[in-house]
Amino acid sequence: MRKIFVLWLLLLSVVSLAQPYSVKQLGIEKGLSNNYVVSIAQDKQGFLWFATEEGLNKFDGTRFITYLKNEDLTRQGITGNELNCLLDDPQDSILWIGTQRAGLNAYDYVNNTFLCYRHDGENPESLITDDVTKIVAAKDCNLWIT
């Protein structure tokens, strides 16, 4: 009787493992700006964000929206296309974007606005460098930036 029970459990586990997973490959052919993805984050609205060597990409489950460096200084945008890291702020509706040599960007995804933080040699409170490689949320609602 014990052998039958063990056999039944084994068969049940095999059947439960046979459930198919749906995997979707996303790349430049689907609208991603570059296949070299350096960071991925999910915001509070459920959107996926991809940091690449050629811009910031927002995926809504169907299509990509790409945010590139804005050369027109009268409009808002990210300060560089070569990105290092992403962090969805645990408190606010802000996506933090670390760039290579172009500072730290804060994207408010509710109001669709960007803020930029750069190194300023005249301001000791500014970033120590414009190359932001990692952003981590601290327990006290501050950010650790390297």
Regions found by a protein language model. Give the residues of each.
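Carboxylate-rich, polar loop motifs that coordinate divalent cations or form catalytic acidic clusters
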Residues: 1-146
